[in-house]
Design a protein with these regions (language model features):
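Nucleotidyltransferase catalytic core that binds NTPs
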Residues: 1-103, 107
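Hydrophobic alpha-helical segments, chiefly the membrane-spanning helices
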Residues: 112-114
């Protein structure tokens, strides 16, 4: 079974999120979604989420492409998820293609762009 992972804050869940999750699910048999609880913890310049974690979790839970949801608060917790779960492919948005990803993260899973 091929396990995929993608993550976001998923604030104000919309059709673009659903399409991204649909594309991510095409690349794996089991899709784990990391739910960032508050992007401002690691990056104060980001906006605080409008919806609560519960609201965002509930919306993700209702999406048929999502098999498991793992909330996380910090980049360190994200790294812990990526190193603790048997992830075969990490799916990230095309807009992140030019960003550097640490070799530690790359060594744990293949990165694919949705």
């Amino acid at each position: 079974m091929r396990v995929g992972f993608t993550c976001s804050a998923f604030d104000l869940f919309h059709a673009g999120h659903v399409m991204m999750l649909k594309e991510a699910k095409k690349q794996c048999d089991f899709l784990i979604v990391g739910l960032q609880t508050d992007p401002t913890i690691d990056r104060p310049e980001k906006n605080k989420p409008i919806q609560t974690v519960f609201e965002r979790y509930t919306q993700l839970e209702a999406c048929k492409y999502v098999d498991q949801i793992i909330p996380y608060a910090t980049e360190k917790e994200l790294l812990d998820i990526l190193t603790s779960y048997p992830i075969d492919v990490r799916i990230i948005g095309e807009e992140y293609r030019s960003e550097e990803h640490t070799s530690e993260l790359q060594s744990h899973s293949f990165i694919s762009y949705a």
